């Protein structure tokens, strides 16, 4: 059983000094910089971007509401 390099196996959270374990805006245990594309545009022509403070890839605020 291998342990993820970002994960403290006892606490089941990021190791000390690391930001994250996984997610679209996490790479090498750190949050991706704000403005990094995390989801490329499809039909609407607007990319989604990382915030620099979360592993989530928030929906571009200029896109319409999801159906």
UniProtKB/Swiss-Prot annotation:
InterPro entries: Disintegrin_CS, Disintegrin_dom, Disintegrin_dom_sf. SUPFAM superfamilies: Blood coagulation inhibitor (disintegrin). GO terms for biological process: cell adhesion. One of its GO terms (cellular component) is extracellular region. The keyword Secreted applies. Disulfide bonds join 6-29, 20-26, 25-50, 38-57. Keywords: Cell adhesion, Cell adhesion impairing toxin, Disulfide bond, Secreted, Toxin. A motif (Cell attachment site) lies at residues 42-44. Expressed by the venom gland. The keyword Secreted applies. One of its GO terms (molecular function) is toxin activity. Coiled coil: none annotated. It comes from the Eukaryota. It is found in: Secreted. Residues 1-65 form the Disintegrin domain. Belongs to the venom metalloproteinase (M12B) family. P-II subfamily. P-IIe sub-subfamily. Negative results: does not inhibit alpha-V/beta-3 (ITGAV/ITGB3) integrin. Heterodimer with EC3A; disulfide-linked. Inhibits adhesion of cells expressing alpha-4/beta-1 (ITGA4/ITGB1) and alpha-4/beta-7 (ITGA4/ITGB7) integrins to the natural ligands vascular cell adhesion molecule 1 (VCAM-1) and mucosal addressin cell adhesion molecule 1 (MADCAM-1). It is also a weaker inhibitor of alpha-5/beta-1 (ITGA5/ITGB1) and alpha-2b/beta-3 (ITGA2B/ITGB3) integrins. The inhibitory activity of EC3 towards alpha-4 integrins is associated with the MLD sequence of EC3B subunit. The ability of EC3 to inhibit ITGA5/ITGB1 resides in both subunits A and B. This is Disintegrin EC3B. The lineage of its organism: Eukaryota, Metazoa, Chordata, Craniata, Vertebrata.
